[in-house]
UniProtKB/Swiss-Prot annotation:
PANTHER family from the UniProt entry: 2-SUCCINYL-6-HYDROXY-2,4-CYCLOHEXADIENE-1-CARBOXYLATE SYNTHASE (PTHR43248), TRIPEPTIDYL AMINOPEPTIDASE (PTHR43248:SF29)
Signal peptide range in chain numbering: 1-36
Active site: 249 (nucleophile), 474, 503 (proton donor)
Entry-linked Pfam families: Abhydrolase_4
Protein name as it appears in the record: Tripeptidyl aminopeptidase
Main location: secreted
Keyword Signal belongs to the record: yes
Species the sequence originates in: Streptomyces coelicolor (strain ATCC BAA-471 / A3(2) / M145)
This protein's encoding gene: tap
Length: 541
């Protein structure tokens, strides 16, 4: 699932990266030559081996073409809202890599040069924040905002962001009118009857049909392997012989696929908050695993709220805080707050807390105000802003890309009985997110284009050590995913932040992690063994 952001309040997604912004459709809750084939030599992906060979040849052609063309850098358009001296441009790629001379699309990229001397420069560091559906164009702003965490790395690298295919300024796709997408209140994601389930199934089917009607030409090509090929073309357009890459959340899966397809094109790769790359997890089982992890992190937040009852007055035990949540949820189900905030919108707002420690105090404060009688604070935080047409279009686009990539990347159960069985079972013990997540992904059950077989992620010849960073109690990308990728990428190193659960670790202040990320990016060096770091500072009320 993705983080929901119908509400217009700042979240950590723009900086730490994540499964990034969106809203559930019904539950709201958000250079070197290209390698010839996958590292295992078999067609584990788009059909069969011949298809992979055609796409690999197409990627090589596109990369060579981009290397010759380069990028025409210029000041960014005013509506991109990127401060100078950040520069913007486009890279042209095939829509279908099996047809490299066929229809082309343009990918938006931006950059800021390294802050150190020419002799200190090591190349470009390309970033993906996650999603699928997240824009990386804010990455160079870490330099203009003088982020202390990234100051050392910025001396050595140009910071480069991009909008992946289908996102933002890169041939954007859409599945529904944005203003319709954000209307509230949406149906309660927890079904109270079989009729409720039928209604949600109808919405999911109509959403999938809308994706095909509005963006059908792009849908078959909205896959992680194609985005990885795009990434290699961007590398070539930048004039980089090898890729330096930072990927967070879904960006870790993009990195894993890139490292499998182009192992000898990787120079440095940091993956933070890792999607489990196992083929039997992508993507149906991965979302079920999230439901369990979100419940655990939700309880962590409730424990923290209870420990700070003097500040929030929501109860001094987890059970009391949960009781307040259930009362709020029931009240919103009976009569939506302000006419627009029902249970779906509440989940959209409150899920920030399981995602990020930085949201713990703000979420608790607004919850506390509601219990004390200030309903408006919660309405302002959780309700959509229909006047924000640009933001709503971005949210709808992000959700469309999320759905398109996850539904096309892999095969999903087409039988409703499977979904009903699995989510009914999970909801009993993990009620916070289960049904909301299910409805968000249900369009994949009736997806109108061919669903692929995920790549077998593994080490290929030439892949250097990859640095993996993960918090132990991450809800969006459970810890087991980092362990799985660590096992698949030989020579990789795993840094674990114990007793912590924020999603997106490299952007937090934790010297045990920050110093090792700097060392790796600046020298390629890693510890002789995996490292466990103490958690970053606990939030304060």
């Amino acid at each position: 699932m993705r983080k929901s952001s119908i509400r217009r309040r700042a979240t950590a997604f723009g900086t730490a990266g994540a499964l990034v912004t969106a809203t559930l459709i019904a539950g709201a809750v958000s250079a070197p030559a290209a390698s010839a084939a996958p590292a295992d030599g078999h067609g584990h992906g788009h059909g069969h081996g011949r298809s992979w060979d055609r796409e690999a040849r197409g990627a090589a052609i596109a990369a060579a073409r981009a290397a010759r063309a380069g990028i025409d850098w210029e000041d960014c358009a005013a509506d991109w809202n990127l401060p100078k001296p950040i520069q913007c441009g486009y890279v042209t790629v095939p829509m279908d890599y099996a047809k490299p001379y066929g229809k082309q699309i343009r990918l938006a990229v931006d950059r800021i040069g390294n802050t150190g001397t020419r002799s200190e420069r090591q190349g470009a560091l390309i970033y993906n924040p996650g999603g699928p559906g997240g824009s990386g164009l804010r990455f160079p702003a870490r330099v203009t905002s003088k982020s202390a965490v990234w100051a050392n790395t910025a001396k050595a690298y140009d910071f480069v962001g991009f909008d992946p295919r289908g996102v933002g300024h890169s041939a954007p796709i859409s599945c529904v009118d944005p203003q319709e997408f954000v209307k509230a209140p949406k149906a309660d994601p927890v079904p109270g009857s079989e009729a409720d389930k039928r209604a949600q199934r109808k919405l999911a089917r109509e959403y999938a049909e809308g994706c095909f009607e509005r963006s059908g030409e792009m849908l078959p090509h909205m896959t992680t392997p194609n985005t990885a090929r795009d990434l290699d073309v961007i590398r070539a357009a930048l004039g980089e012989k090898k890729l330096n890459y930072l990927g967070v959340s879904y960006g870790t899966y993009l990195g894993a696929v890139y490292g499998t397809l182009f192992p000898d094109h990787v120079r440095r790769m940091v993956v933070d908050s890792v999607v489990n790359p196992s083929r039997d997890k992508i993507w149906y089982q991965a979302n079920l695993d999230q439901d369990v992890a979100f419940e655990g992190r939700w309880k962590d937040w409730q424990d923290w709220v209870a420990a700070n009852d003097a500040a929030y007055h929501l109860g001094d035990t987890r059970a009391e805080v949960q009781d307040q949540w259930l009362k709020l949820r029931a009240a919103a189900a009976k009569k939506p707050l302000g006419g627009v905030v029902g249970p779906a919108e509440l989940i959209s707002f409150f899920q920030s807390a399981p995602y990020y420690d930085s949201a713990w105090a703000p979420t608790a404060e607004i919850f506390s105000k509601y219990v004390a009688g200030d309903t408006q604070a919660l309405v302002d935080a959780a309700a959509p802003d229909l006047s924000d047409t640009a933001g709503n279009a971005s949210a709808e686009n992000g959700n469309a890309v999320y759905t398109a990539v996850e539904c096309t990347d892999a095969k999903w159960p087409a039988n409703w009985r499977t979904w009903d069985r699995d989510n009914t079972r999970l909801h009993r013990d993990h009620p916070f997110m289960t049904w909301a997540n299910a409805w968000m992904n249900l369009p994949c059950a009736t997806w109108p284009v061919k669903q692929q077989t995920p790549l077998n992620v593994k080490t290929g010849k030439g892949l250097p050590p990859v640095l993996i960073v993960q918090s132990e109690r991450d809800a969006a990308t459970p810890y087991e995913g980092a362990v799985e990728l660590h096992q698949r990428f030989r020579g990789s190193r795993l840094i674990t932040e114990r007793d912590a659960g924020s999603h997106g670790v490299t952007g937090l202040v934790n010297p045990c992690i920050n110093d090792r990320v700097d060392t790796y990016l600046l020298t390629g060096g890693t510890d002789a063994r995996d490292v466990t770091c103490a958690p970053h500072a606990t939030p304060r009320p």
